[in-house]
């Protein structure tokens, strides 16, 4: 939600128990806390890669963050849709993700703080891989194996939703949004998730 205050505009985000998708899909509202925590870690590593967190309300499971004007921070997905293809944006997305993964690797403190296994499984592994395995039994064994491997790997802090719709092409490089699925696990997930979305965008712009 965009809020107007005496000091200017800001964004307020609240976690809802039911996600805004066509099918009935529920998720724990604690994912809001994971997002704030990820933003705070990421800004220490690459200060320009996330919006600034302005305040948190634990009771309502909401937080306020800096408003980034779309004129200066267009959504990367919309750029790709419109044929604005900047390879440098993709390079900087990879560089910033790598910096976050590298800086958070081998951190027992972060592993404990981001032990959001149940949320990550529900929002990412079950909803994508397990659901696909049910619909396509011929590849079920491979998908279940991938779920098992991904769940077992605990190497670095993972964003969990790195797609062009959650990335702003800012003047100082890409800005990551929507880290509700943040989890300490397999950083390969972030890379594969983003590459999958980029491959799908090729349908728009071969």
PLM regions: where:
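Residues immediately flanking
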Residues: 14, 67, 116-117, 179
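Active-site catalytic-loop/activation-segment of kinase and kinase-like phosphoryl-transfer enzymes
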Residues: 99-149
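Short intrinsically disordered, low-complexity coil segments enriched in acidic
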Residues: 1-10, 55, 87-90, 114-120, ...
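Conserved protein kinase catalytic core
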Residues: 19-20, 72, 167, 184-186, ...
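Histidine-centered active-site/metal-ligand motif
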Residues: 97, 101, 159, 197
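Active-site acidic catalytic loop and adjacent metal/ATP-binding pocket
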Residues: 1-12, 144-191
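Active-site activation/catalytic loop segments of kinase-like enzymes and analogous catalytic loops
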Residues: 37, 188-206
């Amino acid at each position: 939600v965009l809020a107007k205050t005496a000091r200017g505009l800001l964004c307020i985000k609240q976690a809802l128990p039911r996600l805004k998708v066509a099918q009935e899909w529920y998720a724990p509202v604690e994912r809001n806390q994971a997002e704030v925590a990820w933003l705070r870690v990421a800004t220490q590593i690459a200060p320009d890669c996330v919006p600034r967190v302005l305040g948190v309300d634990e009771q309502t499971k909401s937080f306020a963050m800096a408003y980034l004007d779309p004129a200066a921070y267009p959504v990367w997905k919309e750029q790709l849709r419109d044929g604005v293809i900047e390879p440098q944006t993709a390079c900087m997305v990879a560089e910033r993700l790598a910096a976050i993964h590298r800086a958070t690797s081998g951190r027992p403190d972060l592993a404990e703080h981001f032990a959001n296994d149940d949320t990550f499984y529900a929002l990412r592994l079950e909803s994508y891989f397990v659901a696909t395995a049910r619909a396509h039994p011929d590849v079920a064994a491979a998908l279940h194996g991938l779920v098992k491997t991904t769940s077992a790997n605990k190497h670095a802090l993972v964003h969990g939703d790195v797609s062009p719709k959650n990335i702003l092409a800012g003047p100082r490089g890409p800005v990551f949004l929507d880290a509700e699925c943040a989890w300490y696990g397999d950083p390969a997930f972030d890379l594969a998730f983003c590459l999958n979305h980029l491959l799908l965008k090729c349908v728009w712009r071969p």
